Structures are given as structure tokens and as C-alpha cells.
From Swiss-Prot:
Residue list for modification Asparagine amide: 66
Organism (species): Centruroides suffusus (Durango bark scorpion)
Disulfide bonds: 12-65, 16-41, 25-46, 29-48
Family listed: Belongs to the long (4 C-C) scorpion toxin superfamily. Sodium channel inhibitor family. Beta subfamily.
Stretches assigned to coiled coil: none
Record carries keyword Secreted: yes
Tissues expressing this chain: Expressed by the venom gland.
GO BP terms, alphabetized: defense response
Protein name per Swiss-Prot or TrEMBL: Beta-toxin Css6
Domain notes: Has the structural arrangement of an alpha-helix connected to antiparallel beta-sheets by disulfide bonds (CS-alpha/beta).
Matching SUPFAM superfamilies: Scorpion toxin-like
GO cellular component: extracellular region
Main location: secreted
Amino acid sequence: KEGYLVNSYTGCKFECFKLGDNDYCKRECKQQYGKSSGGYCYAFGCWCTHLYEQAVVWPLPNKTCN
């Protein structure tokens, strides 16, 4: 599974500005989803890879980013 890293309180994606390989996104994805996951910056949001099937990713149901 893959998807955008999301803040469960706000419903917002984690923003990033250095597109492609991005240490911040890698670190945040690993912290949220475990060390087997990876991440990079895609369309100014952290995109996480190698997630477990039940991983919660953006968008969250009934929660908009405000």
C-alpha cells in the first residue's frame, strides 16, 4: 500500500518542498508506519511506500484539512 502521510488530528497531508528524494518524508513515514516503509516528496506532500494494508493515509473520511 502507498499513500500520503496524514495528520490524524487535522486531516492535512504532511507538506514538503524538496520534491523527490526527501529525508524529512522518509523519517516521518518510518516514524508513523514502521521502519520497513519509505517515503519521498510528491506534489508537495509526503508520499509513503511499503505500508501495511490497514495503514491510515490521506484523505481521512469526514475530516477536511482546515
